[in-house]
A protein has these predicted regions:
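Short glycine-/polar-rich loops that comprise or flank the Walker A/P-loop
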Residues: 14-17, 34-35, 46-50, 75-76, ...
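Conserved strand-helix element at the start of the C-terminal RecA-like helicase core
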Residues: 71-94
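Interdomain hinge/linker at the junction between the two RecA-like core domains of SF2 helicases
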Residues: 10, 14-70
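Conserved helicase motor
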Residues: 82-87, 103-119, 130-137
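A short beta-strand-to-loop transition that corresponds to the Sensor-1 phosphate-sensing loop
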Residues: 15, 21-25, 82-85, 132-134, ...
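Conserved segment of the helicase C-terminal RecA-like domain
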Residues: 162-194
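A short beta-strand element within the Helicase C-terminal
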Residues: 130-152, 165, 178-180
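SF2 helicase catalytic motif II
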Residues: 1-2
Length: 204
């Protein structure tokens, strides 16, 4: 008698019908689906955020600081998505030097601290969040109107089409939602993300 945990292939052999549900379905789900049904309109009836391309030099520069300051001045929230822990630290220090309070979210933060940060976000005590992978999903804050993404065209697992769409979605709860993609060229993943978001905006 085999008494081991089923792997994915074992599961597929034992299941006749599977329903995949995802906001960002991968090639596997699409290729293995006989029928695909779209749900593009959001429950809050707000369109997906507008995508704006910024030069790579914008990230960490004076114009970015001004945009962050303008956004929080309206009582709204900014999410800054970095490419590395070093970049997170640099941006956190930069904001501090410009008298802008911010919090950092990363995988080492305990659940209680994460809940506290989310509570302070929704309560308006925190206006800027900086992170890497933790900003992809699960942070639904209606005050977030600006997402800034570092090196949006970089070719790695943090900048796939799916990840870019997920990070952009953090600004989808606010009617003023915008996403600044910082890059000096357009990668295929970034182009795909922009195309998908524009498609959704058109339908919404």
């Amino acid at each position: 008698i085999k008494n081991n945990v089923l792997n994915f292939d074992d599961l597929k052999d034992r299941v006749n019908t599977i329903t995949y549900m995802s906001a960002t379905p991968s090639k596997f789900e699409l290729d293995n689906s006989e029928y695909v049904s779209e749900l593009v309109t959001r429950p809050n009836n707000i369109v997906d955020p507008k995508i704006i391309i910024k030069a790579g030099e914008y990230f960490g520069g004076g114009k970015m600081i001004n945009d962050v300051r303008d956004t929080i001045g309206k009582g709204e929230t900014v999410f800054i998505n970095c490419i590395s822990r070093k970049s997170v630290s640099n941006i956190h220090t930069l904001l501090s030097h410009n008298n802008i309070e911010s919090e950092v979210i990363h995988f080492k933060i305990k659940q209680d601290k994460r809940k506290e940060i989310l509570r302070d976000l929704r309560g308006g005590k925190i206006n800027v969040i900086i992170g890497i992978n933790m900003l992809r999903e699960g942070l639904d804050v209606k005050q977030c109107s600006l997402v800034i993404i570092e090196q949006a065209s970089r070719n790695n697992f943090l900048r796939t089409k799916s990840c870019l769409i997920q990070v952009s979605g953090r600004a989808a709860r606010n009617i003023n939602g915008e996403v600044f993609m910082c890059c000096n060229h357009i990668s295929s993943s970034l182009a795909g993300a922009i195309e998908e978001i524009d498609y959704r905006r058109g339908k919404q």
